[in-house]
Amino acid sequence: MDNQFFKNIEKKTGVKMQDVMNLAGSLQNANFKDENTVRSVINRVAQMANRRVPKELEDKIVESITSGKEKLDFGTISKMMDNK
């Protein structure tokens, strides 16, 4: 990918692409049926996005992902956070 592309994303979102790449790398072999793993991912994404995730919403996201109803990706978590 073009380095300027990443710089534009960083500028618009405030999220460093290195942080995104590090998170993506840590997810490759993660067990998404494990509640603690999913909570950790939610907290990392929330921290990167500078968003607070209320406990009730976190519980809903965890239940959706660990039950297999939802796939774990930034889009899914972002959508759930926006629908609070």
Swiss-Prot record:
Q: Which UniProt keywords apply?
A: Cytoplasm, Sporulation, Transcription, Transcription regulation
Q: Where in the cell is it found?
A: Cytoplasm
User: What induces or represses its expression, per the UniProt entry?
Assistant: Transcribed by the SigK RNA polymerase beginning 4 hours after the onset of sporulation.
- A GO biological process held by the record: sporulation resulting in formation of a cellular spore
When this gene is knocked out, what is seen?
Disruption of the gene results in a reduction in resistance of the mutant spores to lysozyme and heat. Mutant shows a defect of sporulation at stage VI, resulting in loss of spore coats.
What broad class describes the main subcellular location of this protein?
Answer: cytoplasm
Highest taxon above the source species = Bacteria
* A GO CC annotation given for this chain: cytoplasm
Among InterPro entries, the record links this protein to:
SpoVIF (IPR025942)
Briefly, what is this protein's role? Answer: Transcription factor involved in spore coat assembly and spore resistance. Required for gene regulation during the latter stages of sporulation. Regulates the transcription of at least cgeA, cotG and cotS. May directly or indirectly control the function of the GerE protein.
Q: What is this protein called?
A: Sporulation-specific transcription factor SpoVIF
Species for this entry: Bacillus subtilis (strain 168)
Q: Which gene encodes it?
A: spoVIF
